[in-house]
């Protein structure tokens, strides 16, 4: 069995930010520079995170419905793992 050359760190030492708030909303584009994206639903996600010094920052991004479904599925998997710890 090969040894990893990377140092092994516990989960707490890898945490760089803390999730403070998570909001999402469903939207539909009605006008755009790119007509191909009109009338397609999207999910807007707004995150509030605190870095290791406590400074809070807002982050936002948009995802298609399939991207959001995958994002949600991954969060469910994370939650299931956390429950076993």
UniProtKB/Swiss-Prot annotation:
One of its GO terms (biological process) is signal transduction. Its main location: nucleus. InterPro entries: COMM, COMMD4/6/7/8. GO terms for molecular function: NF-kappaB binding. Keywords: Acetylation, Cytoplasm, Nucleus, Transcription, Transcription regulation, Ubl conjugation pathway. Belongs to the COMM domain-containing protein 6 family. This is COMM domain-containing protein 6.
